[in-house]
Each structure stands twice: as C-alpha cells, then as structure tokens.
C-alpha cells in the first residue's frame, strides 16, 4: 500500500468498525478520515480539510479537540449514530515508531455512559429481540448505566406496546428478523437498529455468553425453564454485543431477572396515551401527566423507579396493600416523612455511580460524590428502620450503609477533588507517605522560587523584576525595557516581549527541574493510588447497587406521602 503508516493503522481499525464513525486519536485531537470526515463535517459542522498521505492522494480530514469529545459524541448519539473511539494505548514519548492505537469503546445510543448523554430520571435501555415459532418474541433489556438486565416473553401482537413502554434507545436484531413485518410495525422508524448475524442469537452460543458473564456453571439458579430458549437467546446475544462495544468488559451487571406475567399490568400504547401517564395527549404540550403530578422524588433513582411503577401498575393485591401501608404511615407521621426526605436529599445517583465504577469510567469527583452520599445513609437507615410498616422497616433495617467504603473514601480522597485525575490534588494528605514527601519537595521548591523575586530584586537593583510562570516557558524572571541595562550577566534570555524580556538563571533552572520532576512523579503516583482505591470500591459494587435500589423505593414511597399531604 502507498498509504503512510498512520493511514494503514486507521484502515485496519476502520475495517473492523465499518458501521461506525471512527474517531482516531492523534495528539490532542480525534480525527476523522475519508467518508467519516465528510459525514462528520456535515453532521457536526466541522471544517473539512485534508491530510497528506505519502505517495497516495490526500485524504479528507476533519477533527475535534480531545477535551471536547463528549460534546460531539452527544450530538451524534442524539442523531442515532454509532461512534468507535480509537485511542493511543501507549505513551507517545515512549513509543518506538508509530504510537499503538486500539478501539477502546464504541458509543451507541443504547450503550452510552457519559452523564451528558443520559437522562437522570429515565433508564437508557438497549433491547435485543428474537422471534419464536409461536409468534411471540424473546426480549432482553439492559441499562448499561445501572447494570439492570432482564428478559421476558412478549406474546404475539404485544411487541409494539412493550417497546412503547420501554422506549429503548437502540434495538439489537438478528438478520432474519430485521426486515420482518412485525418489526416494521412494532419498532418506530426513528428507533436506531443494530443488525447482527443469526448465529449470534443461537441458543447454545447465547447460553455460553450468559454463563461466562456471570461466572456460573448453570443458568438454573436464575430461574430459567426448559421453554425459555427465546429468553436465553435474546439475553446472551445482548451480552455478546456488549462485549463487542466495550472490549474492556463490565463488572457491574446485576443478576438477570426473568419477568413472568401476572405481577404487573402491561398497558398498551393507547391506554398510556389516553391516561396521559408519562406524556400529554397532544404532542408539544407540557405538563399535566400523572408522572409530573406524582413526582416528588428527591433522588435520580427514585425518579426512574417512579416512572417504572406508573408504567407497570401492580396487580397482586398483597403487594399493593404493602405499598399503601408504607405510604399511609408516612402520611400520618410528618416526623418520619421529613426525616426520610431530608436524609435522601443527600444521596446522589448510587446506581449510575456503580455503573461508572463497573466500566472504569469513575472519576475523582464521582468518588467524592459517593463518599458524600454514603455519609447520608445512616440517617436514612435509622429513619426507615424505626417505621412500623413492614416494607419501610425492611428497606431501612437491611440497608447497607457501607461503612468500610465510606472510611476508605474519607481517608483517601480529597475533600473537593477535581473532575479529572490529571488535574492533580485527588489523593488526601496522609493516605500515602511517599506522595506526601514528594509534595513537600515540590512545595519547598515552589516556595524557594517565590523567594527568588525579593533576592533578585535586591541583587540587580531592579525593583519591578517579577518571577512568573506559564505552561509553555516554565518559570522566568521578567524585566521591563527600561531596566534592561541593569540585567546581571548570569541572566539568560528566554523570551522577548513587546515591553521587556524574560530570563532564567542556572539557579532558577535547577529549582524549576525539581518542581517539574516532583510534579511528574506526583501525577504518576496519584494515578496508581487512585486505581488502587477504585479497585477496592469496585469490590463493593453489588452492595452499592442493592443500597441504591432500597433508596429508590424509600424515595418513591415517601414522595407519594409528600404529594398526598401537599394536595
């Protein structure tokens, strides 16, 4: 090939992701080439230019700054597009020849994880469908952001209603089903569809994927029965697709739930619309839905659960009475109601924090948010545990406050951590003796450099001399034009300005190197220490998910009482 090595590397990655726009990391930018560049320029309003390609012709090029990637991904996902992220997977400074690059993630409407791509108060479902000889369908749904996975049989003629209730962001289909009349009728034309070969949906292959995902020898423990082959096929294909999307894997999948008929009422599209459960009868109108009237929840998990309860009303009398008893107690007891809601307001989105931990996307600020949330759990547990209704009491008594995780985060993470790890200042003083010692060296060197200003002013007789710093030139001594005749002989010119000159001295250079050397080591050490803390927290993800589910239920029950009293 006459392509440059970089373009050969791009072609290799693109050949495995033909159905995606390939964002290819080059330095501080993600670049798109050839047809991707032309489409990206059209969809995102990017400038279309070209890149030299050795002996081959120039290739179309468009690019976005790496730090702005999420903004551009958000726009593409909203348009229903798939994006493959090809990252540099080795330090360019250490690379021998071409920097190694790999596709680390594929972002699709049904598998997004970034906060700005998700709605706080609704699930983001990826759905897989398979057909059955009797006309029914096996359906699996997954919210990657929370780890919720469930499978169910959808009777013949009810697929449209079920997809309307779930409002998935993406549907995964076997090739044989993709063009069928029932899919054309049931799935809105605007719903992004991903089609894969039929073998991926075969029962043996799908069952093996489920066994591997949950590290079990048998699926019997989940409650699968002999006639559940369509459920297994849909669930296993969905797991396999997730592995394709996220090669690094996920560790936060909850146990697969098998949804059987009889516990909740399935509402068809006409019923949902006429009752204005979650959207008004006339599109474009605002307000007036049952969801808006009843939503007094104070946590994102509670908001999502309320939406589910409205769309899936219970039909089992005992469960209805249990919920009514819990709400009635909260209505009758302002002390219980207020104590619960006051404590719940301090809890952030535990379910999605668990998802970030399980997909290695958790940042310093996320762990700070988790720590602050865990501090509120004992008050929630105490208030609920003292209730007399069975449901509220059990939710509170069995609530895991995760004291060990709280102690870890309180000891390891700074009070106000930055959003990004590379910004520094993530690890709390006292967590690592080595880190504390290197920070002391850096701070001492900075203090010495700061003291240079007074000493150099006195030595040179230049009262306006300043010590400054910028990221391009490092530390410098700045002298105005009027004082250039007083500059000592050991000042070395560093930069010429309109109104003066910037210099360094051997002494300043020596101390600058101490600061930079310490900062480099601090950055490396914080990355290592943060990874260690994250790994410890990852071991508690199932507990975190269970606590999140309990918090959501307590939130909705107390919100019902709050709305009842208010109206």
Identify what each model region corresponds to.
Residues 1-329, 338, 342-358, 362-454:
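Charged catalytic and DNA/RNA-contacting regions of genome-maintenance
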Residues 320, 343, 347, 445, ...:
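Intracellular alpha-helical coupling/juxtamembrane segments of multi-pass membrane proteins
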Residues 88, 250-259, 455-468, 562-567:
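Long, charged, glycine-rich C-terminal linkers/tails
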Residues 1-2, 486, 490, 494, ...:
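Conserved NTPase motor "head" modules and their coupling/switch loops across ABC/AAA+ ATPases, GTPases
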Residues 497, 501-535, 551:
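Extended, charged coiled-coil "arm/hinge" scaffolds of SMC/Rad50-like chromosome-maintenance ATPases
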Residues 405, 412, 419, 475-491, ...:
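Cytosolic, long alpha-helical scaffolding segments
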